[in-house]
Protein backbone atom coordinates (compact mmCIF):
# COMPACT_ATOMS: atom_id res chain seq x y z
CA UNK A 1 0.00 0.00 0.00
CA UNK A 2 1.49 3.32 -1.13
CA UNK A 3 -0.68 5.67 0.93
CA UNK A 4 -0.51 4.54 4.54
CA UNK A 5 -0.52 6.25 7.91
CA UNK A 6 -1.78 6.05 11.47
CA UNK A 7 -5.20 6.99 12.82
CA UNK A 8 -7.34 6.43 15.91
CA UNK A 9 -10.31 4.14 16.28
CA UNK A 10 -12.21 2.94 19.36
CA UNK A 11 -12.98 -0.77 19.58
CA UNK A 12 -15.80 -2.49 21.46
CA UNK A 13 -16.47 -6.18 22.00
CA UNK A 14 -20.16 -5.64 21.24
CA UNK A 15 -22.73 -2.91 20.72
CA UNK A 16 -23.54 -3.21 24.43
CA UNK A 17 -19.98 -2.43 25.54
CA UNK A 18 -19.91 0.29 28.20
CA UNK A 19 -16.24 1.13 27.69
CA UNK A 20 -14.48 1.26 24.33
CA UNK A 21 -10.75 0.83 23.85
CA UNK A 22 -8.96 3.60 21.93
CA UNK A 23 -6.40 2.15 19.54
CA UNK A 24 -3.95 3.81 17.18
CA UNK A 25 -3.19 1.72 14.13
CA UNK A 26 -2.13 1.96 10.51
CA UNK A 27 -4.68 2.31 7.76
CA UNK A 28 -3.18 -0.79 6.14
CA UNK A 29 -3.81 -2.75 9.35
CA UNK A 30 -7.43 -1.64 9.40
CA UNK A 31 -7.86 -2.55 5.73
CA UNK A 32 -6.48 -6.01 6.47
CA UNK A 33 -8.91 -6.44 9.37
CA UNK A 34 -11.84 -5.26 7.27
CA UNK A 35 -10.87 -7.72 4.54
CA UNK A 36 -11.24 -10.75 6.80
CA UNK A 37 -14.28 -12.85 5.91
CA UNK A 38 -16.38 -13.63 9.00
CA UNK A 39 -19.15 -16.16 8.37
CA UNK A 40 -22.02 -16.43 10.84
CA UNK A 41 -24.05 -19.61 11.31
CA UNK A 42 -27.37 -18.61 9.71
CA UNK A 43 -28.36 -18.49 6.05
CA UNK A 44 -29.25 -15.22 4.34
CA UNK A 45 -32.92 -16.22 4.23
CA UNK A 46 -32.88 -16.98 7.95
CA UNK A 47 -31.25 -13.62 8.68
CA UNK A 48 -33.69 -11.46 6.72
CA UNK A 49 -36.60 -13.43 8.21
CA UNK A 50 -35.40 -12.83 11.78
CA UNK A 51 -36.71 -10.05 14.00
CA UNK A 52 -34.78 -6.79 14.09
CA UNK A 53 -33.59 -7.65 17.60
CA UNK A 54 -32.31 -11.06 16.50
CA UNK A 55 -30.65 -9.55 13.43
CA UNK A 56 -28.78 -7.17 15.71
CA UNK A 57 -27.56 -10.07 17.86
CA UNK A 58 -26.41 -12.03 14.81
CA UNK A 59 -24.37 -9.23 13.25
CA UNK A 60 -22.92 -8.04 16.57
CA UNK A 61 -19.45 -9.50 16.15
CA UNK A 62 -17.86 -6.49 17.83
CA UNK A 63 -17.27 -3.15 16.24
CA UNK A 64 -15.53 0.19 16.16
CA UNK A 65 -15.98 3.94 16.02
CA UNK A 66 -13.74 5.80 13.57
CA UNK A 67 -12.27 8.22 16.10
CA UNK A 68 -10.98 8.81 19.61
CA UNK A 69 -13.45 8.57 22.52
CA UNK A 70 -12.80 10.47 25.75
CA UNK A 71 -12.76 7.98 28.61
CA UNK A 72 -13.78 5.23 26.20
CA UNK A 73 -17.41 6.38 26.38
CA UNK A 74 -19.39 6.16 23.14
CA UNK A 75 -21.49 9.30 23.31
CA UNK A 76 -21.48 12.34 20.99
CA UNK A 77 -20.02 14.56 23.72
CA UNK A 78 -17.04 12.22 24.13
CA UNK A 79 -15.93 12.15 20.48
CA UNK A 80 -12.62 14.02 20.69
CA UNK A 81 -11.85 13.73 16.98
CA UNK A 82 -12.51 11.66 13.88
CA UNK A 83 -10.07 10.77 11.13
CA UNK A 84 -11.99 7.90 9.60
CA UNK A 85 -15.19 8.41 7.65
CA UNK A 86 -17.58 5.46 7.93
CA UNK A 87 -20.87 5.67 6.04
CA UNK A 88 -23.60 3.12 5.31
CA UNK A 89 -25.29 3.00 1.92
CA UNK A 90 -28.56 1.15 2.50
CA UNK A 91 -30.13 2.17 -0.83
CA UNK A 92 -27.22 1.46 -3.15
CA UNK A 93 -26.89 -0.14 -6.59
CA UNK A 94 -24.55 -2.81 -7.89
CA UNK A 95 -22.41 -0.39 -9.93
CA UNK A 96 -21.62 1.82 -6.96
CA UNK A 97 -17.92 0.93 -6.76
CA UNK A 98 -17.36 1.64 -10.45
CA UNK A 99 -19.09 4.99 -10.07
CA UNK A 100 -17.14 5.81 -6.91
CA UNK A 101 -13.74 5.14 -8.47
CA UNK A 102 -14.62 7.46 -11.36
CA UNK A 103 -15.43 10.25 -8.88
CA UNK A 104 -12.67 9.69 -6.31
CA UNK A 105 -9.06 8.52 -6.54
CA UNK A 106 -8.68 8.57 -2.74
CA UNK A 107 -7.98 5.76 -0.28
CA UNK A 108 -11.17 3.83 0.40
CA UNK A 109 -12.74 0.52 1.34
CA UNK A 110 -16.22 -0.54 0.26
CA UNK A 111 -17.63 -3.71 1.76
CA UNK A 112 -21.00 -5.38 2.00
CA UNK A 113 -22.95 -5.23 5.24
CA UNK A 114 -24.62 -8.32 6.70
CA UNK A 115 -27.85 -7.73 4.73
CA UNK A 116 -26.05 -7.16 1.43
CA UNK A 117 -27.16 -9.15 -1.60
CA UNK A 118 -26.90 -8.74 -5.37
CA UNK A 119 -30.62 -8.06 -5.50
CA UNK A 120 -30.47 -5.43 -2.75
CA UNK A 121 -26.92 -4.06 -2.37
CA UNK A 122 -25.98 -2.59 1.00
CA UNK A 123 -22.48 -1.25 1.49
CA UNK A 124 -20.23 0.46 4.00
CA UNK A 125 -17.84 3.11 2.69
CA UNK A 126 -14.71 3.79 4.74
CA UNK A 127 -12.26 6.59 3.93
CA UNK A 128 -9.34 7.99 5.96
CA UNK A 129 -9.10 11.78 6.21
CA UNK A 130 -5.95 13.86 5.80
CA UNK A 131 -6.12 15.08 9.40
CA UNK A 132 -8.05 14.71 12.63
CA UNK A 133 -11.32 16.66 12.47
CA UNK A 134 -13.83 17.90 15.02
CA UNK A 135 -17.32 16.46 15.27
CA UNK A 136 -18.87 19.34 13.30
CA UNK A 137 -16.16 19.17 10.65
CA UNK A 138 -16.77 15.43 10.33
CA UNK A 139 -20.48 15.85 9.64
CA UNK A 140 -19.85 18.62 7.09
CA UNK A 141 -17.19 16.55 5.30
CA UNK A 142 -19.10 13.27 5.28
CA UNK A 143 -22.31 14.93 4.07
CA UNK A 144 -20.43 16.68 1.27
CA UNK A 145 -18.89 13.41 0.10
CA UNK A 146 -22.26 11.67 0.35
CA UNK A 147 -23.74 14.51 -1.67
CA UNK A 148 -21.22 13.93 -4.46
CA UNK A 149 -21.96 10.19 -4.53
CA UNK A 150 -25.72 10.64 -4.13
CA UNK A 151 -26.98 11.35 -0.63
CA UNK A 152 -30.25 9.47 -1.10
CA UNK A 153 -28.19 6.27 -1.26
CA UNK A 154 -27.13 6.69 2.37
CA UNK A 155 -28.74 5.76 5.67
CA UNK A 156 -29.91 9.12 7.02
CA UNK A 157 -28.48 8.43 10.50
CA UNK A 158 -25.06 7.33 9.26
CA UNK A 159 -23.49 10.77 9.78
CA UNK A 160 -23.62 10.53 13.59
CA UNK A 161 -20.14 11.14 14.98
CA UNK A 162 -20.35 8.39 17.61
CA UNK A 163 -21.81 5.88 15.17
CA UNK A 164 -20.88 2.26 15.87
CA UNK A 165 -19.83 0.16 12.90
CA UNK A 166 -19.83 -3.62 13.29
CA UNK A 167 -16.87 -5.54 11.96
CA UNK A 168 -17.88 -7.15 8.66
CA UNK A 169 -19.75 -10.45 8.71
CA UNK A 170 -21.84 -12.44 6.24
CA UNK A 171 -24.42 -15.24 6.41
CA UNK A 172 -22.89 -18.66 5.82
CA UNK A 173 -24.28 -19.00 2.28
CA UNK A 174 -23.27 -15.53 1.02
CA UNK A 175 -20.03 -14.21 -0.50
CA UNK A 176 -18.30 -11.28 1.17
CA UNK A 177 -18.14 -8.18 -1.04
CA UNK A 178 -14.90 -6.24 -0.47
CA UNK A 179 -13.15 -3.57 -2.55
CA UNK A 180 -10.05 -1.45 -1.81
CA UNK A 181 -8.61 1.61 -3.52
CA UNK A 182 -5.11 2.84 -2.68
CA UNK A 183 -4.78 6.59 -2.99
CA UNK A 184 -4.22 9.87 -1.14
CA UNK A 185 -6.25 10.35 2.01
CA UNK A 186 -9.10 12.70 1.26
CA UNK A 187 -8.17 16.32 2.02
CA UNK A 188 -10.38 17.47 4.89
CA UNK A 189 -9.65 21.16 4.34
CA UNK A 190 -10.30 20.96 0.61
CA UNK A 191 -13.75 19.51 1.29
CA UNK A 192 -14.53 22.11 3.97
CA UNK A 193 -13.34 24.93 1.71
CA UNK A 194 -15.71 23.77 -1.01
CA UNK A 195 -18.52 25.24 1.10
CA UNK A 196 -19.19 28.99 1.11
CA UNK A 197 -19.28 28.53 4.90
CA UNK A 198 -18.99 24.96 6.14
CA UNK A 199 -20.23 25.98 9.61
CA UNK A 200 -23.62 26.87 8.12
CA UNK A 201 -25.42 23.53 8.40
CA UNK A 202 -28.15 24.72 6.03
CA UNK A 203 -25.57 24.31 3.26
CA UNK A 204 -24.87 20.67 4.10
CA UNK A 205 -26.36 18.12 1.68
CA UNK A 206 -29.47 16.41 3.06
CA UNK A 207 -31.65 13.58 1.81
CA UNK A 208 -34.71 14.33 -0.27
CA UNK A 209 -38.01 14.42 1.60
CA UNK A 210 -38.94 10.85 0.72
CA UNK A 211 -35.91 9.61 2.68
CA UNK A 212 -36.30 11.80 5.75
For the regions a protein language model found, what residue spans apply to each?
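Catalytic "initiation/cleavage/transfer" segments centered on a nucleophilic residue
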Residues: 2-8, 12-40, 48, 131, ...
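Generic secondary-structure boundary/loop-capping signal
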Residues: 76, 126, 162-164
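Signature for HUH/AEP ssDNA processing cores
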Residues: 1-121, 128-140, 144
Amino acid sequence: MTYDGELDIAIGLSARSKVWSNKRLKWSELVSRLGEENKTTETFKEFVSASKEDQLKIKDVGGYVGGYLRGGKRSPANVVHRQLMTLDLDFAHKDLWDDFTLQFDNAAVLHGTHKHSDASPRYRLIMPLSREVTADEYVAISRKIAGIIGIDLFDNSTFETNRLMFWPSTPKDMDYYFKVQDGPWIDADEILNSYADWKDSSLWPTASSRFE
